[in-house]
Amino acid sequence: MKLKKVLSVITCATLLFTAFSPLMSAYAVGETDYTIVNPYDCVDWDKWDYYKANLHTHSVASDGDLSITDMVELYYSLDYDILAMTDHGVINYGWNKPRQTNGIFNYFRKADPMSDEDYLRITTGSDRNGRGMIDITRGIEMNMAVMTKTHVNGYFTDYGQAVWGNENDYRSSVAAVDRYGGFTVLNHVGDWVNSNNFPERSHQDFYISYFANIFKDYKSCLGMEIINNTDSVTRADRALWDELLQVVIPTGRNIIVFADDDSEYVSDVGRSFEYFLLPENTEENVKQAMQVGNFFACSKFQKYTDGTPGFEGNGEVPLVSNIK
């Protein structure tokens, strides 16, 4: 897939949402020697392409407004290439596979799977010049039904089906998915920290220590969302991410960042997303990139913590054409 408007520039604003930019802040501390690892070293910029993704998506299988088919079709119609369904407490084994819902949590609605015919059409791109949209299977949002919204996305996991959550607890879900051999991402942590209302909390030792210990203990916890939907609850999460990097990077690992719609309604779709750099659009390549970080977290929205009016972009985001 060839995308227009690819810019061969690297600015501070562009690098804000890359997986490696804040490494420099850790490097500047003290006299310790640091090795800066570029997650884009693996990219063949002349041959690899960009693929647009949303990795946090809901349907009537949990608290979404659209059927599974309608939600998938909507992303497909908007030229997405990668989609993970991550309903609360419901593992996606395939858009065309039956799933078990959780009664009152999805208002006892039916969650019919996509037809095999539509599944084949979309995943092969037979009506889109052969550019299919791949199904990231075994995705789920865990810690279902907690009031404190300590939500964790699981990927490539068989854990979490119908498991009700624990209040004020991210660690348990991360630990369980780790035992099952999958991967996790911490979702919209500003919801729990309430840092959109109290941005100073992103710099407080309690929260820094809590999340840093999770990342240090579980390498399978790949990272965190730094933008969710329109950035309302995540506006201070980038500051927390920067604080966490200073603590976690010296232990030998990075914290990869994500930006996703967390879509429940039609109006949620297309707000925040990832652009993956891949040799080919396959589930295995996406899985590898999620671990390495050869993608960019992007959004049309940015909100601030100092009362400055937020930003809403129009058109396509600029894309990096090379990193040297």
Language-model-derived ranges and their functions:
Residues 168-180, 206-219, 235-252:
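Histidine/acidic residue-rich metal-binding segments in metalloenzymes
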Residues 32-198, 225-241, 260-263:
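A metal-dependent hydrolase metal-coordination microenvironment
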Residues 202-232, 278-285:
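Structural recognition of alpha->loop->beta junctions
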Residues 17-32:
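Sec-dependent signal peptide cleavage junction
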Residues 2, 79, 219-220:
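Short loop/turn motifs at secondary-structure junctions
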Residues 4-19:
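Sec-dependent N-terminal signal peptides
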Residues 97-102, 199-204, 208, 272-274:
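Short low-complexity, flexible loop/linker segments enriched in glycine and/or proline
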Residues 29-33, 37-45, 71, 248-256, ...:
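C-terminal functional module detector
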